[in-house]
Amino acid sequence: MEGLDINKLLDISDLPGIDGEEIKVYEPLQLVEVKSNPQNRTPDLEDDYGVVRRNMHFQQQMLMDAAKIFLETAKNADSPRHMEVFATLMGQMTTTNREILKLHKDMKDITSEQVGTKGAVPTGQMNIQNATVFMGSPTELMDEIGDAYEAQEAREKVINGTTD
């Protein structure tokens, strides 16, 4: 046992596969302050839309790439767990597709709506579409519709199928 050198035993430089490569150290994340324009939200809206859309498409591409790998792995492994992981990934891809379409709908809704800022002066114009307006006195309205109790009774009769 005298010929045993602990330093020689701990030296792993001659083991195959060990090249002494340096491990890449990533720089810490530096957060950047986002500029906001509360008086003119159009640039903010366009920037945010671009960021969200880009992120969703990148996510979709990564999911598709992973799906190809996972499908082959699931086929080769013949394992229910691998198929379950693949099915979960497919569900996530479907969700991302829906979110991309929802983003377009939301953007359309946002851009078609007229949003004013705090300092904006109201124009006095009102745009009402598909509104039913009753022209008459309150008594005539009560005769037409009835009070809240009568209206509730009428709804219950319709629901229960006991209309007269």
Curated annotation (Swiss-Prot):
Homooctamer. Interacts with the terminase large subunit gp17; the active complex is probably heterooligomeric. One of its GO terms (cellular component) is viral terminase complex. It holds the Pfam family DNA_Packaging. It comes from Enterobacteria phage T4. This is Terminase, small subunit. Residues 36-114 are annotated as: Oligomerization. The terminase small subunit binds to the packaging initiation site and regulates the ATPase activity of the terminase large subunit. The terminase lies at a unique vertex of the procapsid and is composed of two subunits, a small terminase subunit involved in viral DNA recognition (packaging 'pac' sequence), and a large terminase subunit possessing endonucleolytic and ATPase activities. Both terminase subunits heterooligomerize and are docked on the portal protein to form the packaging machine. One of its GO terms (molecular function) is DNA binding. The N-terminus contains a helix-turn-helix (HTH) doamin that is involved in viral DNA binding. InterPro entries: Phage_T4_Gp16_DNA-pack. Residues 1-35, 115-164 are annotated as: Interaction with gp17. The lineage of its organism: Viruses, Duplodnaviria, Heunggongvirae, Uroviricota, Caudoviricetes. Residues 1-35 are annotated as: Helix-turn-helix (HTH). Keywords: DNA-binding, Viral genome packaging, Viral release from host cell.
